[in-house]
Amino acid sequence: MNPNKKNNSEEIMHRVIQKLSTQPWFPNDYCNIASKALLNALKAEGKEVRLQYSYTEKGDGHRFVVEKKEGEETILDPTYLQYDKNYPEGFVGQSFPDPKLEKNRTEEKDFMELQKKRYEEGVYDKFFSGK
């Protein structure tokens, strides 16, 4: 890599999207794979990033990357297209346009506790009953 030309986060996200977009179910059901690939690529560039979670409906989960730069946090979501077809190149911004996704943003530990609670409540039974 040319040290004078450091990749910006949005360009890196676009490369991840381009690579995964050949998969038949992309962007649906790909937020875990895409966000992990993006997280690893951004970390390799020395960027301060973490995974964050949200949901629109009880039992539905969504994972994306948050980058912290100069005290500001920016969402990088390579699979936001599944929520809004106006974002084929992913979403980059301070807050989600979808009010439910924005309202329900949470950190990994809290989200995993929520998922466990929902499992215990039987929320996921309908998903597993057909298998």
Predicted segments, located by residue:
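A structural boundary/capping signal
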Residues: 2-131
